[in-house]
């Protein structure tokens, strides 16, 4: 069985991974899909979440691309 301090450390590590990697990735995917179709209040929420998850955005954003899809001519 794990000691209390080990469980606390694992909990902190899990929360750090969730805050710095998982939630910013999911949020960036959501913003990519909804940006052109969202209303004013939804964009306010998006801006708030960008500020809230800013450290994770700095870590995750360089690995994502938001280039437009190629057009068919």
From Swiss-Prot:
Its main location: membrane. The chain crosses the membrane at residues 7-27, 44-64. GO terms for molecular function: oxidoreductase activity, acting on NAD(P)H, quinone or similar compound as acceptor; quinone binding. It is a multi-pass membrane protein. Keywords: Membrane, NAD, NADP, Plastoquinone, Quinone, Thylakoid, Translocase, Transmembrane, Transmembrane helix, Transport. Its EC number is 7.1.1.-. It catalyses: a plastoquinone + NADH + (n+1) H(+)(in) = a plastoquinol + NAD(+) + n H(+)(out); a plastoquinone + NADPH + (n+1) H(+)(in) = a plastoquinol + NADP(+) + n H(+)(out). It is found in: Cellular thylakoid membrane. The keyword Thylakoid applies. One of its GO terms (cellular component) is plasma membrane-derived thylakoid membrane. Coiled coil: none annotated. It is an enzyme of class 7 (translocase). The keyword Nucleus does not apply. NDH-1 can be composed of about 15 different subunits; different subcomplexes with different compositions have been identified which probably have different functions. Belongs to the complex I NdhL subunit family. NDH-1 shuttles electrons from an unknown electron donor, via FMN and iron-sulfur (Fe-S) centers, to quinones in the respiratory and/or the photosynthetic chain. The immediate electron acceptor for the enzyme in this species is believed to be plastoquinone. Couples the redox reaction to proton translocation, and thus conserves the redox energy in a proton gradient. Cyanobacterial NDH-1 also plays a role in inorganic carbon-concentration. This is NAD(P)H-quinone oxidoreductase subunit L. It comes from Synechococcus sp. (strain JA-3-3Ab). The gene is ndhL.
